[in-house]
């Protein structure tokens, strides 16, 4: 039983690289479990024994079930959150460096331990707004492969790095997206 539960949790985590993916995955799980989706902008007709959920902004979800015995008034409430420390890509996403490299213009979100993001392959996932006709629609995206890296500087460029580094998110934590184009003689054969 525990192995199956652990497998389900790991599967959920794998399918949920962002809070938007987590909400979409939870909504699908609730629908499969017989929950009815409600829209916030409509009046709700709730019934005894009904199971319901609603989402807001694609980033939050509330689910509830109504008991059959409504004479016994009580609530059991459990809550959690699906967002976590992350970097959000800004609207003007590309920052080009002097050497032709490209960094992503990001903003840190949440209480993060900055050093843990350094020197490890990272991917990109989340929500984008796409124009379809005369309207914009929300789409989930996940590249599911390593695309960016937030590099530490070499020790000879910052001898005090091991004495406590104070990171500037807008300078030190911008993900490197591309090393730029190589000229014909920029590599060894």
Can you annotate each of these PLM segments?
Residues 1-189:
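N-terminal hydrophobic/helix-forming segments and targeting peptides
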């Amino acid at each position: 039983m525990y192995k199956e539960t652990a497998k389900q949790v790991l599967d959920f985590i794998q399918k949920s690289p962002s809070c938007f993916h987590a909400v979409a995955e939870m909504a699908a799980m609730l629908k499969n479990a017989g929950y009815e989706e409600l829209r916030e902008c409509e009046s709700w007709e709730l019934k005894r024994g009904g199971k319901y959920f609603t989402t807001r902004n694609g980033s939050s979800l509330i689910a509830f079930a109504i008991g059959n015995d409504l004479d016994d008034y009580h609530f059991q409430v459990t809550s959690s959150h699906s967002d976590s420390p992350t970097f959000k890509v800004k609207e003007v996403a590309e920052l080009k460096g002097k050497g032709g490299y490209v960094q992503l213009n990001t903003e840190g979100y949440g209480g993060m331990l900055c050093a843990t993001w350094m020197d490890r392959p990272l991917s990109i996932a989340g929500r984008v707004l796409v124009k379809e006709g005369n309207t914009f629609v929300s789409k989930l995206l996940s590249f599911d492969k390593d695309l960016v890296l937030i590099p530490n500087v070499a020790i000879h460029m910052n001898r005090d790095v091991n004495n406590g580094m104070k990171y500037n998110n807008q300078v030190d934590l911008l993900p490197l997206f591309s090393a730029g184009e190589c000229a014909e003689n920029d590599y060894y054969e």
